[in-house]
């Protein structure tokens, strides 16, 4: 086992604070409308330019191991804030640095670290309740666009595009961000349910100009099995032909004789048919087939529940207004399923989202909710160069996360004003003893830090602006972009409550642990092994020769 280097008390805390400051100082230059960019060197390819706090934090590793421990703990604050709300990483880092700096001063002055932590925790719990009281719902497109604009560093086009996407696919719809091919940003919206499976034979195509199969008011047969024998399907095909409607078959696979017969029937015009593979694999395929059944009002023909294809009737088939199938995707538009059944299915999947343990499972379940409840929108980010593309895509993703958080928990006045108002309201808060009261004051003083940093990045004097804002009330604050005072809500400067709340909670959590640190242990650097060069060995041999 490697030997360890151990530091105690003030020595440990000074080293830790130095690491905290290196990381936080690099991250906080990005805060606010006049925040600057940070350039990150990459081992290959062009450097990355970013204004995303967590991207900067992730790149920082320090040579001194004690300082690095401090930096890594603050990095955890940024990562946690990013995971919880998708934004607010820079605010969280600024808050953490402020609490740690003030807290360690109090420890150095002889305060009890555990009581300080209890005071900080008490202040944060009270502050979270105050934030919830200040929060107003964010439901209209204008407010959503404003939140997106602020989070995308005052880029109005991004805010408007996100608001438009939410309008089209609903609050529950999936909105994804991709790299575009042109210079302009584009918004693609897919209404209805789309899954990544295309036609099984190009002979089904009835729109040669688009290379797609388009069927109006089709029946939809859902089968959780491979279909290779056409005899199994004859009763359904005959019933559909009599009804004079097209048929879409979604099955595990359609192959051999069955596929050939369907192609021949389609080409002769006896019955319009198209076959696609069911989406997903294993249990996920069963679940997605059930989703399609709920959406279209059909039944999944599965031998597991005692249903056979030969005995299927028109009542077992789903229906939709339109189905479009191309080489890679199938889109079902306006399924005829009952609204109550669809909502029930959505609620069931949401419950699974709550219980999911892996991010991958959670993402797939949320996609299923979106496909049932709304639709899918894709924002394609346009830029002139690869470097600009990456920077812009990161901003759009942040803005999207912020707008989702705003819809979820509402918004408060932005620009650091909400935390200043909360701190003012809690000025009379007290705890069990004087050391805990100092902890409360540490947390309340730290709540001014985001406002001060925004002002500092804008090139103004933080103390002057902070005192002017504190003298006002309600949503009165400082617009760093235009350098004027006024109502932040009227300026359209809004922060999602969830983002501000998460930033404060995670910052206080890690800062409290760091203030109560008394000892730090790390591996000693390995010294290079002594060089047993050839010359030494030869010298020995020479000596032996002399003895002879």
Curated annotation (Swiss-Prot):
It holds the Pfam family Cpn60_TCP1. One of its GO terms (cellular component) is cytoplasm. Keywords: ATP-binding, Chaperone, Cytoplasm, Isomerase, Nucleotide-binding. GO terms for biological process: protein refolding. Its EC number is 5.6.1.7. ATP binds at residues 30-33, 51, 87-91, 415, 479-481, 495. One of its GO terms (molecular function) is isomerase activity. It is found in: Cytoplasm. The keyword Ligase does not apply. It catalyses: ATP + H2O + a folded polypeptide = ADP + phosphate + an unfolded polypeptide. It comes from the Bacteria. PROSITE patterns: CHAPERONINS_CPN60. Gene3D superfamilies: GroEL, GroEL-like equatorial domain, TCP-1-like chaperonin intermediate domain. InterPro entries: Chaperonin_Cpn60_CS, Cpn60/GroEL, Cpn60/GroEL/TCP-1, GroEL-like_apical_dom_sf, GROEL-like_equatorial_sf, TCP-1-like_intermed_sf. Forms a cylinder of 14 subunits composed of two heptameric rings stacked back-to-back. Interacts with the co-chaperonin GroES. Belongs to the chaperonin (HSP60) family. Together with its co-chaperonin GroES, plays an essential role in assisting protein folding. The GroEL-GroES system forms a nano-cage that allows encapsulation of the non-native substrate proteins and provides a physical environment optimized to promote and accelerate protein folding. This is Chaperonin GroEL.
């Amino acid at each position: 086992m490697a030997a360890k280097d151990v530091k105690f008390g003030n020595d440990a805390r000074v080293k830790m604070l130095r690491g905290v400051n290196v990381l936080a100082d690099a991250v906080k230059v990005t805060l606010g409308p006049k925040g600057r960019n940070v350039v990150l060197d990459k081992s290959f390819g062009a450097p990355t330019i970013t204004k995303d706090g967590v991207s900067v934090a992730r790149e920082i590793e320090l040579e001194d191991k004690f300082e690095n421990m401090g930096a890594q703990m603050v990095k955890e604050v940024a990562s946690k804030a990013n995971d919880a709300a998708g934004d607010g990483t820079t605010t969280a880092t600024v808050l953490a640095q402020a609490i740690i700096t003030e807290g360690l001063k109090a420890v150095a002055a002889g305060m009890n670290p555990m009581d300080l932590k209890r005071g900080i925790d008490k202040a944060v719990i009270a502050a979270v309740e105050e934030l919830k009281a200040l929060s107003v719902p964010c439901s209209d497109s204008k407010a959503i666009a404003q939140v997106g604009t602020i989070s995308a560093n005052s880029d109005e086009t991004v805010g408007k595009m996100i608001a438009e996407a939410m309008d089209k696919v609903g609050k529950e719809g999936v909105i994804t961000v991709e790299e575009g091919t042109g210079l302009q940003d584009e918004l693609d919206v897919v209404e209805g349910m789309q899954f990544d499976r295309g036609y099984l034979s190009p002979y089904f195509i009835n729109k040669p100009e688009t290379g797609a199969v388009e069927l109006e008011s089709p029946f939809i047969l859902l089968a959780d099995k491979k279909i290779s024998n056409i005899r199994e399907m004859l009763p359904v095909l005959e019933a559909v032909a009599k009804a004079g409607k097209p048929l879409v078959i979604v099955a595990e696979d359609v192959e051999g004789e069955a596929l050939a017969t369907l192609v021949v029937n389609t080409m002769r015009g006896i019955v319009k048919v198209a076959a696609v593979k069911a989406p997903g694999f294993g249990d996920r395929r069963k679940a997605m087939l059930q989703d399609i059944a709920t959406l279209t009002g059909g039944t999944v023909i599965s031998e597991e529940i005692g249903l056979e294809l030969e005995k299927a009737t028109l009542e077992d088939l789903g229906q939709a207004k339109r189905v479009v199938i191309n080489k890679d995707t199938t889109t079902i538009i306006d399924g005829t399923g009952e609204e109550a059944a669809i909502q029930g299915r959505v609620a069931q999947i949401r419950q699974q989202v709550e219980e999911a343990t892996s991010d991958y499972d959670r993402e797939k379940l949320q996609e299923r909710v979106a496909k049932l409840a709304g639709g899918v929108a894709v924002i394609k980010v346009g830029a002139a160069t690869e470097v600009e593309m990456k920077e812009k895509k990161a901003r759009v993703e942040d803005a999207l996360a912020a707008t989702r958080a705003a819809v979820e928990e509402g918004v408060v006045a932005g620009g650091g004003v909400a935390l200043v108002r909360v701190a003012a309201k809690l000025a009379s808060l007290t705890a069990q003893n004087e050391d805990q009261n100092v902890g409360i004051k540490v947390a309340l003083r730290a709540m001014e830090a985001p406002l001060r940093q925004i002002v500092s990045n804008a090139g103004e004097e933080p103390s002057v602006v902070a005192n002017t804002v504190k003298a006002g009330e309600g949503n009165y604050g400082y617009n760093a972009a235009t350098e004027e005072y006024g109502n932040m809500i009227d300026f359209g400067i809004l922060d999602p409550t969830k983002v501000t709340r998460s930033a404060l909670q995670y910052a206080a959590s890690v800062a409290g642990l760091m203030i109560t640190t008394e000892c730090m242990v790390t591996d000693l650097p390995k010294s290079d092994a002594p060089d047993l060069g050839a010359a030494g060995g030869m010298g020995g041999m020479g000596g032996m020769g002399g003895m002879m």
